[in-house]
Amino acid sequence: MEWKTCSFCEGKIEPGCGKKYVKKDGSVMQFCSSKCEKNFKLGRVGRKLKWTNMFKRMNKGQ
């Protein structure tokens, strides 16, 4: 089994865990927690939230 990455925070998702969300255009989003899913549905961007791995990776040198 392979680990997947969260579409919102880029965190790792264990096999058999997490949630999948299919948008109207057919693209699939995978979330590691309900926190990520709720923030996505509220229209927030993972790059702007300090607790996400995406933010930490982009602002590593600062």
From Swiss-Prot:
Binds 1 zinc ion per subunit. Zn(2+) binds at residues 6, 9, 32, 36. One of its GO terms (cellular component) is ribonucleoprotein complex. A zinc finger (C4-type) spans 6-36. PROSITE patterns: RIBOSOMAL_L24E. Coiled coil: none annotated. Gene3D superfamilies: Ribosomal protein L24e. Keywords: Metal-binding, Ribonucleoprotein, Ribosomal protein, RNA-binding, rRNA-binding, Zinc, Zinc-finger. GO terms for molecular function: rRNA binding; structural constituent of ribosome; zinc ion binding. SMART domains: TRASH. Belongs to the eukaryotic ribosomal protein eL24 family. This is Large ribosomal subunit protein eL24.
